[in-house]
């Protein structure tokens, strides 16, 4: 007898095959049969008229803290996700020395905008080493599966202490220690190791995250630390994946370590004319196991006056006079005509390719509104609104930021949405079998 039978569901199996109606039998936690099933089960579910699909595996999440206190991992589990991968972008909470706990929280808060107060209250720190962190995850009841990676930021903090994000060159002994910690984590069950080389990632104090400027020698040593272990993965977020030089380094790294490399690009040049995907396909044909990560719909960041970033956060007046004010005081000051005039006359001090030309960036910034649209057109952007109204684009951004109670959020897609659709992604070749993806229905 089966444990469970899901009857008469419309199955979409994830292979690209046409949907079909069938029964699914479960035994001992595994699918035992699919088709017309006449045997009984301890429990049956009538799924007629319902879609039955594989659970989603979300390969890029930041539940590293939440997974230690929330068995449901909402909202992912609400949307059909059955496995989440954490430890991305080089941020996470193990290994950790007691004195560095607040630093790792501040790092996660700055990089991923997860409230530090929630992390401080929720994490009980029943671990120091990475294997102990895995034990803590395993001992906690949960509705869905979790997997994680060893984060570069935590590794550097553990070995280098206060020098972790200010000293770009660790000693040989420190590199050896970090490589051993990576190996220890992967041997204990981590999927691999993650790092970040984007200037977008900073802690709440504005310091670049540990590993941002790590040299190729350090990266290679850490990769070699998990060579040959458990089909390990190396995940890298980078500002430079539109540059041929970066790809040569990545290919050499993959060749020497034998690891599967998965990449996330943060800048438009990597996506222009599908450059990153074409380079990945070329690398695959050369024998390199390199897989870019791609979103099935635009993903990005939300920013506003109540988040850690907005269009004017790099302006001197903001940093020197406004950043420490409470929200009501801040909105009142920003509505002062002289403050507005002063800020609009300034230039950002943020030294980042993506943020250097703020007026151009406004073509990729959209007021979220009460009914969010996550696939907006240019006309919906701040630049589109400014063009329609024949107004200065940064003045429009300023006015939208302080309208109402100053609580408006702005959506900035990342990851190849510069053409205002995902057509290039949808038609890029599949590294697995070279089949062309089918364009989505307009329905």
Regions found by a protein language model. Give the residues of each.
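Divalent metal-coordination and catalytic microenvironments
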Residues: 9, 29, 49, 80, ...
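Histidine-rich, glycine-flanked metal-binding segment
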Residues: 1-55
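Divalent-metal coordination cores built from histidine and acidic residues
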Residues: 69-192
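Hydrophobic alpha-helical segments, chiefly the membrane-spanning helices
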Residues: 439-442
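Di-metal (Zn2+ and/or Mg2+/Mn2+) metal-binding site signature of metallo-dependent hydrolases
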Residues: 53-73
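Functional cores that coordinate and move charged inorganic groups
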Residues: 168, 182-185, 190-312
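Hard-cation-handling environments
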Residues: 294-415
């Amino acid at each position: 007898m089966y444990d469970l039978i899901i009857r008469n569901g419309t199955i979409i199996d994830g292979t690209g095959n046409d949907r079909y109606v069938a029964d699914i039998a479960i035994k001992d936690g595994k699918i035992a049969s699919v088709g017309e099933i006449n045997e009984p089960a301890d429990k049956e579910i009538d799924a007629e008229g319902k879609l039955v699909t594989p659970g989603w595996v979300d390969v890029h999440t930041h539940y590293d803290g939440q997974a230690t206190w929330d068995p449901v991992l909402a909202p992912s589990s609400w949307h059909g996700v059955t496995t989440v991968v954490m430890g991305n972008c080089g941020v996470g909470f193990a290994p950790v020395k007691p004195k560095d706990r607040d630093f790792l929280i501040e790092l996660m808060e700055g990089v991923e905008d997860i409230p530090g107060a929630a992390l401080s209250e929720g994490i009980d720190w029943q671990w120091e080493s990475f294997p102990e962190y895995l034990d803590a995850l395993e001992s906690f009841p949960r509705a869905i599966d979790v997997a994680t990676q060893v984060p570069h930021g935590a590794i550097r903090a553990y070995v280098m202490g206060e020098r972790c994000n200010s000293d770009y060159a660790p000693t040989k002994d420190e590199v050896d220690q970090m490589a051993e910690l990576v190996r220890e984590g992967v041997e204990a069950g981590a999927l691999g190791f993650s790092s970040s080389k984007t200037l977008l990632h900073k802690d709440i104090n504005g310091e670049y995250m540990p590993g941002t400027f790590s040299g190729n020698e350090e990266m290679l040593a850490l990769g070699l630390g998990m060579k040959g272990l458990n089909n390990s993965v190396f995940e890298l977020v980078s500002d430079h994946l539109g540059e041929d030089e970066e790809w040569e380094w990545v290919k050499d790294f993959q060749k020497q370590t034998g690891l599967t490399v998965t990449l996330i690009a943060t800048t438009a040049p990597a996506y222009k004319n599908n450059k990153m995907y074409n380079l990945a396909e070329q690398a695959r044909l050369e024998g390199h196991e390199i897989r870019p990560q791609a979103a099935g719909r635009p993903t990005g960041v939300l920013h506003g006056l109540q988040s850690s970033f907005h269009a004017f956060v790099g302006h001197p007046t903001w940093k020197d006079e406004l950043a420490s004010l409470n929200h009501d005081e801040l909105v009142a000051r920003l509505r002062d005509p002289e403050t507005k005039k002063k800020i609009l006359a300034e230039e950002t001090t943020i030294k980042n390719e993506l943020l250097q030309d703020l007026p151009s960036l406004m073509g990729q910034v959209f007021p979220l509104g009460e009914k969010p649209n996550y696939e907006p057109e240019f006309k919906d952007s701040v630049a589109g609104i400014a063009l329609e109204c024949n107004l200065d684009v940064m003045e429009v951004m300023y006015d939208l930021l302080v309208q109402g109670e100053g609580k408006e959020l702005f959506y900035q897609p990342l990851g190849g949405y510069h053409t205002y659709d995902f057509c290039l992604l949808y038609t890029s070749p599949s590294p697995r079998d070279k089949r062309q993806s089918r364009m989505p229905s307009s329905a």
